[in-house]
Amino acid sequence: MALRKTRISALATLLAATTASGNLLAEELRLITWGGYAPDEVVAQFEEETGIDVKITLSNNEDMISKLRATGGAGFDLAQPSQDRIVGVQRQFNIYKPIDYSRINTGQLQASMVNATQESTALDGQSYGVPSVWGTSGLIVHSSVADTVTDYTDLCDPAVAGKVSYRLKRPTLIGFAFAMGMDPFAAYEDRDEYQSILAKVEDKLIDCKDNVKTYWTGGDQLLSLLRTGEVTAAMAWDAGGWKLNAENPDIRFVAPESGALGWIDTFAIPRRSENEEAAYKWINFVMQPEIAAKITNASGNFTASKGADEFVNAELRDAYRLSFDEEAINNIKWYPPVPPGLEAMEGQVLDRVQAAN
């Protein structure tokens, strides 16, 4: 009997050890993210260093919200929504949990981006996002007009008449408002004040129409116009400017004097995450400067990792440094969440600008 009990005990111990080992080997991080944000090289290094398998689902803001809303915040351990798509969604659907910043190595992050993300993802005194990848809208200019076009409203200068392009979208309204000395983001919660700002910007954009070669609608269209010289100054995304700079150093992206307009894609923890520990490990791992640089090289967008630009591809690094010194980064105007109703107000203004003679 004693021998039998000993054998049973030994078998139980072996099974327990096997189960524990199996759980360890099967540990998994389920990440829903954008294309380019989890390069194979980075995933392989993380898996090797931690023993955690990474399961990636490529997505976008709308799809992330849909999937997490359908499950009440289950199915994924880590998500990467944009910073302006968190608070409203969380208030309505409760699909995320607050970030424990004591578990984040903030020393390796750009302080201005941490502050911007904490502020824009704050709800009931808690923050729901950590900055990851960022980008901006600003100015792409040919060197021949670089001294003339240093802010959004300079696109209306006679020196670039007929050689200008920008989109009839929110960024144009916001950028012109800042360049005109107003703060549209501060007016987001005051509909009357925001309408007053839009009216002034509308008048400016109508007066500026003679300068506009075309209102661009697609990135490839704009890049083609800038390559041929049909357009010498435009409001556009930084990544497009850096791409052109690699082809022609006489074209570059400029952070406007009133501030580039910035977006941040974040890390957010789904409310029913099953491996929160792995999520924090991934965040701290990929935001190391040398690892973050690999994400920049893969996606074309820079990350919030401090010092990562030292390790990115030389051409991209040099173009970035030409566009953004520390002062320009600190001057970025980060998009806050958009209150209900503002899009309709903006749409009416843009329609009138389009129709004006």
Mark where each language-model region is.
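A ligand-binding cleft/hinge motif common to bilobed small-molecule-binding domains
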Residues: 85-88, 233-250
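Conserved C-terminal helix/tail region of periplasmic/extracytoplasmic solute-binding proteins
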Residues: 326-357
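Extracytoplasmic ligand-binding site segments that recognize negatively charged/polar headgroups
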Residues: 80-223
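N-terminal signal peptide c-region/cleavage motif recognized by signal peptidases
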Residues: 17-21
